[in-house]
Amino acid sequence: MSNPRHNEREVRSPRGDELNAKSWLTEAPLRMLMNNLDPDVAERPHELVVYGGIGRAARTWDDFDRIVATLKTLNDDETLLVQSGKPVGVFRTHKDAPRVLIANSNLVPHWANWDHFNELDKKGLAMYGQMTAGSWIYIGAQGIVQGTYETFVEAGRQHYGGNLKGRWILTGGLGGMGGAQPLAAVMAGACCLAVECDETRADFRLRTRYVDEKTHSLDEALAKIDAWTKAGEAKSIALIGNAAEIFPELVKRGVKPDIVTDQTSAHDPVHGYLPLGWTVAEWRAKQENDPKAVEKAARASMKVQVQAMLDFWNAGIPTVDYGNNIRQMALEEGLENAFAFPGFVPAYIRPLFCRGIGPFRWAALSGDPEDIAKTDAKVKELLPDNKHLHNWLDMAKERIAFQGLPARICWVGLGDRHRLGLAFNEMVRNGELKAPIVIGRDHLDSGSVASPNRETEAMKDGSDAVSDWPLLNALLNTASGATWVSLHHGGGVGMGFSQHAGMVICCDGTEDADRRLERVLWNDPATGVMRHADAGYDIALDWARKQGLRLPAILGN
């Protein structure tokens, strides 16, 4: 029997200003869905896998075809409902309603675990959407580069006087998310040694200039890191190997990185983490015929790696979990102090979230890189005093290779996002841009996620696991008129550990879009300020007052 999730066809988004659908509001999700499966974007496009273990864009290839066909005929007063990658219904709504509403991987809490999900997945009843895979706004590794860069810069500020020159970062994983780490480290002024078990992923990062060099030798990798740091150069190297083997070996040798983290796909113990002593081919085969054995061996291996990370931490080396739930896996394997070192959000990012600052991103539906160059310039024009952001945009222009449709990631917050959206829409209206653009974000944002081991770890009021907030965020974005809205479970950290929402809005140059953009791009980050103000963060409370938010139970207004 043929595999409904495997097809050798090549998918690429249309370019230019010619419509394949009835309007840009349906053309936009069509192009971004297809862009998610572009071979220059997705990790395993022939299997519908975009990134993050088994994060897919559609449940099966038949479902992909049905979604495409439906979007091509969808009217501007209709909404398509997508249930775990399957187009289940079209309903009449109104012109300001989302054209697509997506729910991926959601399970009743008692059943929200990998065993039950994998059973449903095997029967063809579910799909893992990760965060931006099933919500059709993945833009390649660039999507996490700036967040990783901001994390490394803040780590340098806290631990090394704001200067990472001559220092190096040890990490694992070069997949769709982890692949951003070497480039982010170099942009922050540091060297990076990234351990990756799958050589094809390292080659992908080499091809797209996210990593500088590759080796199979630990000794060679360390020699290069030593030479680069002594010379004050910022360069990166991918080491083909298993992090569960390499990290303990470095501890044994007494090697001391300056920062330690990890972005293997440890959130998924079957599809995301190579067990110690296994070949990649053996691992892939047993995922299908003996997943329980894979999970058992992978979890034991994660415990070994986390113990090594604890050893680095206990040696005084800044060590953080980068949101893949590897500490939780080690804890469940009996490593009682697995959470001794922090996650990256409470350690470095939360003050940004308190002001609604997060991973704002946009993509040029024209396919023309010049449209991104023009929007980059517009950002600088509208935010003239944000020199840190200007520096980021300059580095991004120089170092980041576009994957699929040209796109940009740019961390901005409440008060700035709607201004940029309106300016971009005006650029479409007056012909400065060759076609409309879409604006979206990662689900990793200030008000759109509940994830106690990542974004909402160690909240001031103890509300880490309260998931009302992403539900309210999705509802508000729907009411505000986003072009498509998504509500997912399990992204980043795996089944049972997160709920999160996403939105994308199309700048088609119309006055209707102006009104929608102003609502969506104000309300969306405002929910993040609200959420952190409710938890008692002074930065968020002050920002809420400054921005004039009406928060009756929080500000009493």
UniProtKB/Swiss-Prot annotation:
**Cross-referenced Pfam families:** Urocanase (PF01175), Urocanase_C (PF17392), Urocanase_N (PF17391)
Question: What chemistry does it catalyse, as a reaction equation?
Answer: 4-imidazolone-5-propanoate = trans-urocanate + H2O
Q: Which InterPro entries match?
A: Urocanase (IPR055351), Urocanase-like (IPR023637), Urocanase_C (IPR035401), Urocanase_central_sf (IPR038364), Urocanase_CS (IPR023636), Urocanase_N (IPR035400), Urocanase_Rossmann-like (IPR035085), Urocanase_sf (IPR036190)
Q: Which SUPFAM superfamilies match?
A: Urocanase
Record carries keyword Metal-binding: no
> So which cofactors does this thing need?
NAD(+)
GO molecular function terms attached to this record: urocanate hydratase activity
For the region Disordered, give the residue spans. Answer: 1-20
Taxonomy, superkingdom: Bacteria
| UniProt EC number | 4.2.1.49
Q: Name one GO cellular component term.
A: cytoplasm
Q: What does this protein do?
A: Catalyzes the conversion of urocanate to 4-imidazolone-5-propionate.
Name of the protein in its database record: Urocanate hydratase
